Amino acid sequence: MQKKRSRAGAAEQEAASDDGEMSDSSDKMEVSQNKGKSGIKRAPEADDVLRPVKLSKSDLYKPPTNDELNRLKETENLFHTNLLRMQIEELLQEVKLKEKRRKTIDGFLHEINALLGTIPETPKTDLTDQSWLSSSIKVPFLQVPYQVKGKFSFLPPSSIKVVGSYLLGTCIKPEINVDLAVTMPQEILQVKDNLNQRYSRKRALYLAHIASHLTDNKLFSSVKFTYMNSNHLKPILLLRPQGKDEKLVTVRIHICPPPGFFKLSRLYPNKNNVRTSWYTEQQTETEGVCDPPTPYYNNTILSDLTLEHHLHHLTNCATDFPGMKDAIALLKVWLHQRQLDKGFGCFNGFLASMLISYLLSKNKINKVMSGYQVLRNTLQFLATTDLTVNGITMATCSDSSLPSLPDFHEAFQVVFVDPMGVVNLCADMTASKYRQIQFEASESLKVLDDTNVNGFHLLLMVPKPFVRTFDHVFHLTNVAKLQGTCKKMKLLNQLIDRGGDYLATALPYLLSVLSKGLGPRVSLLSHTLTHKPEWNVGEEPAKHKDSGLVTVGLLLDPELYTNVLDKGPAADSSEALDFRAFWGEKSELRRFQDGSICEAVVWTGGSLYDKRKVPELIVKYLLELHANIPESCINYTGNALDCVLSRGRETSTEEEKMVSIIQSYDDLSRKLWNLNDLPLTITSVQGTHPCLRYTDVFPPLPVKPDWSSYHLLREKKCLIPNPEKPCPAYVSPVKVICHMEGSGKWPQDKDAIKRLKAAFQIRLSELLSSQHQLLCNPSATHTDVYKDGYVFRVQVAYHREPQYMKEFVTPEGMLKYQDTEESMQLEMETNHLPHLSSTLHGLHQQHPAFGGTSRLAKRWIQSQLLGDSFSEECLDLLVAHLFLHPAPYSPPSSALVGFLRFLHLVATFDWKNSPLIVNLNGELKGSEYTEIQNDFISARAQLPVMFIATPKDKKDSVWTKNQPTAQMLQRLIVLCLESLRALEQQLMDPRGNHDYKMIFRPPLDLYDVLIRLNPKQISRHREAVDQPAKSFFRGMLKEGAQVKDLMFPVVGYDPIQLFLQELREAYGEFALFFHDLHGGDVIGVLWKPSSFEPQPFKTTNVKGRQMDGKSDKALLVPNAEAFVEDLEILGEGLVAGVEAQTERWNI
């Protein structure tokens, strides 16, 4: 039975704010979670798992009604599942405005209407004489230049009408915006007010006078100004009710001219309405020079003229078409979750409504379609239609005097013309922003077509913040520098058109330059601007230099973005001149292998660490060359966390080290395959160390030990630590599983198999030494091979050994099989782990960011002292899920964005009620997904708290079977939420704290005892998050140093881990111990609350306890003071000090 989640299937939802038909407001939408009563019932147990309801036989076989049959047929035709239909219906029910609330809003609107009619008139004055305005009110308009012709006086509005989504019935919660169109009387305006911002300034003065008479009225909790869609030429007034309804609604006052007042032909995109001589404050116009067109300025006035006409158009379309209203609501939610519905040049609710009406007029949709069908068709249209090349128009009039689509394309980057044929609804949208919308629509359709995912949840419930969507993000921190950009690019005409807004003027040109320069390295480039906020009516509007940040995001091509060479045209071609002009001094002539001589640009990049910085180098170079934006004004965060994967003072993330290890491993594999005189044939050689799948946080380095720092065992040609010297650097053995063929020579007793394997280990050592001159150190369980500076730990395996370990004989003499801890461990090491490692190695080849993402995730887990609770394989699988099931995103192409998504996945996944399915190699099919879900639900109480299913492990979750505990998982979820919030805030606010290592420093105040460690004895000291203040010689010679005779280094020696093991064995019943494996200099100790309950006086309870002096009975309690003393005694030489944080103790 399918599990149903009522109330749109989620407890929390960030959804679209209601932008009205012109809105860009945004806030989180809370969707309540009420479990449906149909087919679902809560089990009485405390495990809080959903279980099927048992129906009576009569209910089970009752024939369906006609309505039910019709609904089932409709569901089958329109939706993947009945669940999707129910989720959409519940979401619409949640976001639509209830009738009770509508009545409250209507009452508020009537009161506003009455107040607007009582505002007194003012005498007629020059536009520049604003002395009549109250000194406590500031005009919401940047009046530059200040001098302008014209007269102004305030007269009561000629009409006040509700426009936008409220009347249409398409506004959605949580924030309801109601748009009021307040029409200025014709007497205020003059015929030539379309020129030189006269109308715009009269509009602002009219708004300011209204604000002065409403600001102290007790009806309102707040009266504020803001810009409509961050367009500074269109200020509006925001009114919110007093009392409990303050957050219910925001009424937005739009000032507009009387219908038909301005002659439309004067405002076509090829006409000029802002004189250059006026804007530059020149006394006379230059003779023979025509003023350039002002399409953006003209479009702003036209949009005010057509408010009512657009409402009538949408009302006619929505008549007898309930699916249109539902689709608008769904599309608003979709846009909001992707942060596309707010700010300058956004795709808001009004635009979505007009697009749906366009599709209706072109018969792409019809009035019998459901909201879901309309949504799908709209997304399909967006994904396949490029409005930057082939604009669309809703105009049906054949008037030849109207501007043509080519006229609009000449003036605007994106073209969508309104029904009147004069307004470009996408005038402020850049081509880059539209391509982002296209990309999101295309990705969303893929999600909807995938029956193995919850498309509703991914499309409409999961937020896609900008910083988590793009692989690299950078900020232009000093917007004032764009003034110089406009001058450098000679954009005076465009600047005049934009009313001096140099950010909006320069942005399209900057994006064009970057897109050309980055070329195939990026598959998508887009931007977001800081949303211009509301401000009090007594404050001056923010100047352009205070506009905030310009943030640009790059979606990288994983194969191409690290390219260090840009090959240009042939040196003698006509394009070569343009190439040199674009790249400046970076362009040079180069001869290529095919003999051609071409222009080229070469970027420095020896290591992969350097190559990942190529997009950053290109961005900074081009912005300085073409836009006069210095490097100091660019905050590039794409590689912000590389520093935590570097050792000590090194500036490398060591991918090349892993490639070197893999090459050495491949060579060893060949040597093993080709060994002569082995009693049995080798059937497979498989590496299992994380570095062989590119996920080791700090891969092993080639080592050459300095004899003087060790004691020498000459007969074994190996070294042992010298206690008088600092602990040697940690040498990690690279584990290799060597499977031998099955044969009758193998015994059938598990102990005999172990002895035979030990003999094989010795024989392997002898053959590798004699045939390939490798230094080997055999033992009963493995053979260590010292090769190329690395130590490979070769372990012989026999595929039937785990089976023999499971054998036991019953008292009746029957042979049976039962899993034992030993058999499961061996099976994991010799079967599951080799297969997983080879699969993840392949995944990294397909997605190069996989390794870096996994390394960051593991480094962060260790830094939070939780490394012992989560296996490396568990974390690798969590990261693999991000790449194999990235929806609603595309697979990450940078480790940073992969890490952000890792934090979000762990923090938000429903671990209690859902298995995390990782479809490695795409082996799982639809029916297997259902099988895993059903098996999980039926056996939930017996399964691990974190359940990860793979094609080879559908029922057991072997990598999380023992760890984490419920408490550790809950702790991780809390840390993920907080770290995600902090890191995203840092990445999106370049003016704040730039210490990205902050989230890698654990809070220590929650521990009861802190054990400070002696840095001399920390073998991985250089791996610490913060570079150690003092370094020690760890007994290793520098790379390239010559040695006379090789000696086996000290392998796998980490005294801190050995100390931790002792502590857990001795005091595990009293406390938990936490440590950062990678250079952590502190061990955190937490008391176990249950261990401090008094125990009866028995010999079995005496260890670590003392008599309870407060009790009359013979009871024992833990001796905490002695425990603290024991820590220093046990850790002599390792422990620098013990801090008992007794203020936390609750004993």
UniProtKB/Swiss-Prot annotation:
Protein keywords: Chromosome, Nucleus, RNA-binding
UniProt GO MF annotations: RNA binding
Coiled-coil boundaries: none
Main location: nucleus
Annotated GO CC locations: chromosome; CURI complex; small-subunit processome; UTP-C complex
Acidic residues biased stretches: 15-24
Residues covered by region (Disordered): 1-49
GO BP term, example: rRNA processing
Superkingdom, natural source: Eukaryota
Subcellular location: Nucleus, Nucleolus; Chromosome
Subunit organization: Part of the small subunit (SSU) processome, composed of more than 70 proteins and the RNA chaperone small nucleolar RNA (snoRNA) U3.
Protein function: Part of the small subunit (SSU) processome, first precursor of the small eukaryotic ribosomal subunit. During the assembly of the SSU processome in the nucleolus, many ribosome biogenesis factors, an RNA chaperone and ribosomal proteins associate with the nascent pre-rRNA and work in concert to generate RNA folding, modifications, rearrangements and cleavage as well as targeted degradation of pre-ribosomal RNA by the RNA exosome.
Protein family membership: Belongs to the NRAP family.
Record protein name field: Nucleolar protein 6
Lineage: Eukaryota, Metazoa, Chordata, Craniata, Vertebrata
